[in-house]
Amino acid sequence: MAFPCRRSLTAKTLACLLVGVSFLALQQWFLQAPRSPREERSPQEETPEGPTDAPAADEPPSELVPGPPCVANASANATADFEQLPARIQDFLRYRHCRHFPLLWDAPAKCAGGRGVFLLLAVKSAPEHYERRELIRRTWGQERSYGGRPVRRLFLLGTPGPEDEARAERLAELVALEAREHGDVLQWAFADTFLNLTLKHLHLLDWLAARCPHARFLLSGDDDVFVHTANVVRFLQAQPPGRHLFSGQLMEGSVPIRDSWSKYFVPPQLFPGSAYPVYCSGGGFLLSGPTARALRAAARHTPLFPIDDAYMGMCLERAGLAPSGHEGIRPFGVQLPGAQQSSFDPCMYRELLLVHRFAPYEMLLMWKALHSPALSCDRGHRVS
C-alpha cells in the first residue's frame, strides 16, 4: 500500500512513516485476532454429524423440482352438494391436484457419508412447536450410532397460516434459526394444517428419493410421541435387509367419519366406501427403504386424501403390500393391567418402541428415567 510521503526525512516524513507503521501493525493484529469456531472451520471440516442446513438449492434434483404454481380447480365447484361442505373440505377439493410445492429449507447433506443411514427419524411438526423439537433433539432424536448403526433426524414442516402476518414472520425467523443451527428441518411452501399432513408424507418420499435413497429404515411420527430409539434399532436389526416393512398399530375396518364438526370428517364425495383399507395409525410407524419407494410410485396414481394415515393404507393397497402390527408401537397410549400402577412408570415403557402422547417435559423425564442406572423393574411391570 502506498503512502503520500516524500523521500526526505523531514518532520512530515517521519509523521507519515509512523502513521504507516501503525496502520500495518493494526492490520496484523486483526489478522491474528482469535475467531469463533464457526469462522475458523473450513468447509472440508464439516461432517454429516453437524448442521447441514441450507435454503433449498438453486438447482435441486428432479425429484424436488416444484410443480407449476398451485391454482384453484374451478371444476371442483361442480361437486355434488359442494356448497353444503365445510369450507376446509371445499378448499381441499379445489387444490387437491396440487402435489409438488417449493422446498423452503433443505438438509441436502443429511445422509452424506460413507456409512449410510440405518434409521431416519422423520418427525411431523408445526412451526410453532419449537419446544417439542428441542426436547426431541435432546432425547430420543439424538443423531448418533447404536451399535454402529447411524440414526439421523428430520423435522417436517409446512408454513404458518396467513391469519397473523406478524406472527408468521416471527415463526419464519425461528425456523430459519433452527435450520441453520441444527440442519434438521425440511419446510415446504404449503400451509401447515391437519388436512395437509398427507402432503408431508408425499414430499418426504420425494426427498428420500433425491437425498437419501439408501436409508435402510424410516420412522414416521408426530412431535408428541416418545420413542425408545435403542429398542427401535434392535427391532429393525432383526429384519431381513431389502424387504418390505410397514409396521405400527393396525387399523382394521376403520370407517370414515361423517360428522362435519369432526376434524376427521370425510364426506361421501371424497370417499364413498364404508371402510378404509387396512393402515397403521399415523401417530408413529416404521417402514423400510424399499417400501418407501413402492409407496412413492403408488402415490402417483392415488388421488390425495385428507386423512394421512388412511392415505398410506390406500397406497399400500395399490402397491399390493400389507401393513403389519407391532405391539410395541402404542399411538393410543398404554393400557395398564391394574389401577395401582402409574401410567408414567418408566418400567411400563422399557420394552416399548413408541408411545403417544407426551408433553415436552414428560418426554425429558421419561428419557432420563429409562436411562438411569438406578432403574429397577420386576416382572409385574407389563402393558397389555
UniProtKB/Swiss-Prot annotation:
Pathway: Protein modification; protein glycosylation. Residues 1-12 are cytoplasmic. It is a single-pass type II membrane protein. It is found in: Golgi apparatus membrane. It is an enzyme of class 2 (transferase). GO terms for cellular component: Golgi membrane; membrane. It holds the Pfam family Galactosyl_T. Residues 34-68 are annotated as: Disordered. Present in stomach and colon (at protein level). Restricted in the stomach, colon and small intestine, where core 3 structure is present. Glycans are attached at N73, N77, N196. Induction: Down-regulated in gastric and colorectal carcinomas, suggesting that it may be used as a marker for distinguishing between benign adenomas and premalignant lesions (at protein level). It catalyses: a 3-O-[N-acetyl-alpha-D-galactosaminyl]-L-threonyl-[protein] + UDP-N-acetyl-alpha-D-glucosamine = a 3-O-[N-acetyl-beta-D-glucosaminyl-(1->3)-N-acetyl-alpha-D-galactosaminyl]-L-threonyl-[protein] + UDP + H(+); a 3-O-[N-acetyl-alpha-D-galactosaminyl]-L-seryl-[protein] + UDP-N-acetyl-alpha-D-glucosamine = 3-O-[N-acetyl-beta-D-glucosaminyl-(1->3)-N-acetyl-alpha-D-galactosaminyl]-L-seryl-[protein] + UDP + H(+). Keywords: Glycoprotein, Glycosyltransferase, Golgi apparatus, Membrane, Signal-anchor, Transferase, Transmembrane, Transmembrane helix. The keyword Magnesium does not apply. The gene is B3GNT6. GO terms for molecular function: acetylgalactosaminyl-O-glycosyl-glycoprotein beta-1,3-N-acetylglucosaminyltransferase activity; beta-1,3-galactosyl-O-glycosyl-glycoprotein beta-1,3-N-acetylglucosaminyltransferase activity; galactosyltransferase activity; N-acetyl-beta-D-glucosaminide beta-(1,3)-galactosyltransferase activity; UDP-glycosyltransferase activity. Beta-1,3-N-acetylglucosaminyltransferase that synthesizes the core 3 structure of the O-glycan, an important precursor in the biosynthesis of mucin-type glycoproteins. Plays an important role in the synthesis of mucin-type O-glycans in digestive organs. Belongs to the glycosyltransferase 31 family. Injection into nude mice significantly suppress lung metastasis, indicating that the core structures of O-glycans are profoundly involved in the metastatic capacity of cancer cells. The chain crosses the membrane at residues 13-31. It comes from the Eukaryota. This is Acetylgalactosaminyl-O-glycosyl-glycoprotein beta-1,3-N-acetylglucosaminyltransferase. Residues 32-384 are lumenal. PANTHER family: ACETYLGALACTOSAMINYL-O-GLYCOSYL-GLYCOPROTEIN BETA-1,3-N-ACETYLGLUCOSAMINYLTRANSFERASE, BETA-1,3-N-ACETYLGLUCOSAMINYLTRANSFERASE. Its EC number is 2.4.1.147. InterPro entries: Glyco_trans_31 (IPR002659).
